[in-house]
Regions:
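Extreme N-terminal basic, low-complexity initiation segments
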Residues: 2-8
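N-terminal beta-alpha lobe that positions the nucleotide/phosphoryl donor
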Residues: 38-220, 311-318, 325-326, 331-335, ...
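NTP-handling and nucleic-acid-processing catalytic cores
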Residues: 174-276
């Protein structure tokens, strides 16, 4: 079955999907007596059903949904919101945290930082319930076995909050991600760190300013096979400068995508026609550094790129088009413009090395009417744009 055939079979409506997430998160947290539901402390992407998505947070639900559509998502599992809920109840932290957050004066930066540090210390100081820890360890061992690296698989441990990746809330980057984590003990420790990152000063302030109720927000954690990225970046299925949905914009650089996402390098930038997949403009930058794995010391390091390679495009024309094809498929899957993180895995053969790390709704222009350049858009382009974007046409 082709990707198109897969996507055309009952594509989910992302807006109704995320609305149901919020309702389910709240219900599942405040009714922990449903023991059969709480037993789902971890779920592998491939085994998660749509009714399980409320347990996975925004990032985790998106990865599970794309994995179910046979898109190229690295194998992994989620430590569910029920594991986090069980931890809070077993440690008697929920009421304490809620009361402390309610008292925070976000206008007082020093006080916000102090309260944030205290809350995170409370979480980091408490042990996981024995059953939760046992399930997480078992799931990591299964993941290692699936990839043929018993006990030694490097993984990314990534926060997946329930207010994350919503169409009307740009929540990205508010919690923590940890790369090249190896071993059961380290996975357990970094899961706890992800839970604690729900209460960074930045995240508390963001929720307060966005009127997001604290008791509506829970944390899932993604544990996913680490990609040894040759090249990585971001693809937007509209032009972020003007909202034009007939274009795809790609930012890319050498190595892991953190250099692009963090702004550490000025990435190569490609503007592509979404219909014809023609590269309209390629702006190639001097990319001085890259993030790469240090396999010996089990960490990610930043290293200088040799001058010749730094000045070269990090994507060929064919690779740019391959990124765009997948980006179009993902946009069709979710039926709204997407902000996609991707990588080319150096350990896989060319043509089979494209991997999806994350996709979330674009949160700026989807709330507005897209603008176009009347002086450059032909009548046919306008017709094609309407045919491609029925949602935009109804606005």
């Amino acid at each position: 079955m082709s990707s198109t055939e897969i996507i055309e079979s009952e594509p989910p409506c992302f807006h109704s999907f995320t609305l149901s997430l919020f309702h389910s998160f709240t219900l599942s947290f405040f009714y922990p007596c449903k023991r059969s539901y709480l037993m789902k402390y971890t779920l592998f992407f491939k085994e998660a059903q749509p009714e399980d998505y409320p347990l996975l947070g925004g990032k985790g639900a998106s990865l599970a949904s794309m994995s179910a559509a046979n898109l190229p998502v690295p194998v992994g599992f989620c430590v569910t919101t029920h594991a986090y809920s069980a931890f809070l109840h077993a440690s008697d932290l929920f009421d304490t945290i809620m009361a402390q957050v309610e008292q925070v004066d976000c206008a007082n930066v020093a006080e916000l930082d102090r309260q944030s540090a205290e809350i995170r210390a409370l979480i980091l100081d408490k042990p996981l319930p024995a059953e939760v820890e046992s399930v997480i360890r078992s799931s990591y061992r299964q993941l290692c076995d699936l990839t043929g690296l018993p006990g030694t698989l490097p993984v990314a441990v990534r926060s997946s909050a329930t207010a994350e990746d919503l169409p009307d809330a740009s929540f990205a980057g508010q919690q923590d991600t940890y790369l090249w984590v190896v071993g059961e003990d380290e996975v357990i420790e970094h899961v706890r760190r992800c839970w604690a990152s729900l209460y960074t000063a930045r995240a508390i302030n963001y929720r307060r300013n966005g009127n997001i109720p604290e008791n509506d927000v829970l944390m899932s954690v993604v544990v996913q096979k680490m990609v040894n990225a040759r090249t990585a970046g971001v693809a937007m299925t509209l032009n972020p400068t003007n909202g034009d949905r007939s274009k795809i914009v790609i930012d890319a650089s050498w190595g892991l995508g953190e250099a692009v996402v963090s702004g550490e390098v000025t990435p190569d930038n490609f503007l592509v026609d979404k219909v014809m997949l023609e590269i309209i403009k390629a702006d190639i930058q001097h990319k001085a550094v890259e993030h790469v794995p240090d396999r010996v010391n089990r960490r990610v390091i930043t290293r200088d790129i040799e001058p010749d390679r730094a000045a070269q495009p990090c994507l060929s024309d064919d690779e740019v088009k391959a990124v765009c094809r997948i980006a179009k498929t993902i946009e069709k899957h979710y039926r709204c413009p997407q902000d996609i993180e991707w990588a080319l895995d150096a350990d896989l053969p060319d043509g089979e090395n494209f991997t999806l790390l994350q996709s979330r709704p674009e949160t700026v222009w989807t709330q507005k009417k897209a603008t176009t350049q009347a002086t450059t858009k032909t009548g046919m382009e306008g017709i094609l744009n309407t045919l491609m974007n029925p949602l935009a046409a109804r606005q």
